[in-house]
Swiss-Prot record:
KW Hydrolase (keyword) present: yes
Segments forming a coiled coil: none
Lineage, opening ranks: Bacteria, Thermotogati, Deinococcota, Deinococci, Deinococcales
Protein name: dITP/XTP pyrophosphatase
Reported function: Pyrophosphatase that catalyzes the hydrolysis of nucleoside triphosphates to their monophosphate derivatives, with a high preference for the non-canonical purine nucleotides XTP (xanthosine triphosphate), dITP (deoxyinosine triphosphate) and ITP. Seems to function as a house-cleaning enzyme that removes non-canonical purine nucleotides from the nucleotide pool, thus preventing their incorporation into DNA/RNA and avoiding chromosomal lesions.
Enzyme Commission (EC) number: 3.6.1.66
Cofactor details (free text): Binds 1 Mg(2+) ion per subunit.
Cofactor: Mg(2+)
Top EC category: hydrolase
Any single GO BP term: nucleotide metabolic process
Protein family according to the UniProt entry: Belongs to the HAM1 NTPase family.
Species: Deinococcus deserti (strain DSM 17065 / CIP 109153 / LMG 22923 / VCD115)
Keyword tags: Hydrolase, Magnesium, Metal-binding, Nucleotide metabolism, Nucleotide-binding
Length: 208
């Protein structure tokens, strides 16, 4: 695959089973004319990494190798100041709670009586190629945590999080409004910018 040609019109696998993430990624990267497809029968490895980068790479590389196609994966998390950065990479399984609602309630209980509600969302997006090359993009969004959920849109901790400069929670915003300011939206915007003129240069030469 030569630089300058890029992935226009090519199939790219989205390595996630989260339908909410798939919708965000499809809309955010619409300008690249990529043909985004799901995982099909591919099973992703467990997220055993200690960082967002490690977890995203695990998923993207597994999908790229299994499908023989470029694959895109995201790992993200909520980092709460009063909890020393928890839940972080464990956001999707915080407190071993089974679903978003239970995890939100668990977080609110952990913060009961806490005046410091500062937090940030972090997202790392990795595009992996079958030859092992990786591209990494990172985005962050800072804000405050509410004392109770608000809104019906979004997923995860969206009902509890009000971004800086906003009065609404992420769950009270449309997908488009959220994408324009979100951590994942910022990481995907960086990816789109890097690919707008074709494949970005590889920092390490690949020897055939």
């Amino acid at each position: 695959m030569t630089e300058g040609v890029g992935l226009k019109g090519r199939q790219v696998v989205v390595a996630t089973g989260n339908a909410g993430k798939v919708r965000e990624i499809e809309q955010a990267l619409a300008g690249l004319d990529w043909r985004l497809t799901g995982l099909g029968s591919v099973t992703l490895p467990e997220e055993t990494g200690a960082t967002y980068e490690e977890n995203a790479a695990l998923k993207a590389c597994a999908a790229a190798v299994a499908c023989g196609l470029p694959a895109l994966a995201d790992d993200s998390g909520l980092e709460v100041e009063a909890l020393d950065g928890q839940p972080g990479v464990y956001s999707a399984r915080f407190g071993n709670r089974p679903n978003d609602r239970e995890r939100n309630l668990y977080l609110l209980e952990k913060l009961r009586g806490e005046t410091n509600r500062r937090a940030k969302f972090v997202s790392v997006v990795i595009l992996a190629y079958p030859d092992g090359h990786l591209e990494t993009y990172r985005g962050e969004m800072t804000g405050q945590l509410l004392e109770g959920p608000r809104g019906e849109n979004g997923f995860g901790y969206d009902p509890l999080f009000v971004p800086d400069g906003e009065t609404r929670s992420l769950a009270e915003m449309t997908v488009e409004e959220k994408r324009a300011i979100s951590h994942r939206g910022r990481a995907l915007a960086a990816l789109q910018a890097a690919h707008k003129d074709g494949l970005p240069p590889r920092q390490v030469s690949v020897i055939d």
